[in-house]
Amino acid sequence: AINQISITEERDEAVDFSDGYYDVNQAIVGFADSAAAGATSVADLQGLRLGAQQGTTSLDFITEQIQPEQEPFVYNDNAAAKAALDAQQVDAIVLDLPTAFYVSAVEIEGTAVIGQFPTTGDSPEQFGMVFEEGNPLRDCVNEALAALEESGELDAIEQEWLSEVVDAPVIELAG
């Protein structure tokens, strides 16, 4: 499956992943007039009602990096998290950056990407394609990804379809 799935150690125990094809940051989406608007650091977000889908790197990011004063609101899927934001039951939701841009541009009128968070740790979060363990197609896909990377085509695709990422302000992790 190619569907914005982040490569994690826990997931890698159950499935095989292709090599990473896109470095992704987490982002926060809220209404332009919400308590989250204008946030420049995680300290500005810690007192807010934040939500994310269960089992996602977005939820992990809230608990591990933002460390809000109250437990995050956890939803079964992104549709429920978006509905909670739309109903203003939460101040903001955390999503991966491409999803955040789509939500704010297409799905929930009046929202904006408040900001994106910088990469943390030794390696960036990456999207990878998911395969059943032992599937021989994974090696073929990895070869194709390597060729796309080497030719510059992967970068060109990112610039054409995901170049908005440069427009999202960075929210500092240090208070």
Each model region followed by its residue ranges:
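Ligand-binding clefts/hinges and TM-proximal coupling segments of bilobed small-molecule sensing domains
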Residues: 57-72, 112-114, 143-175
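Hydrophobic residues within well-ordered alpha-helices
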Residues: 45, 84-86, 129, 141
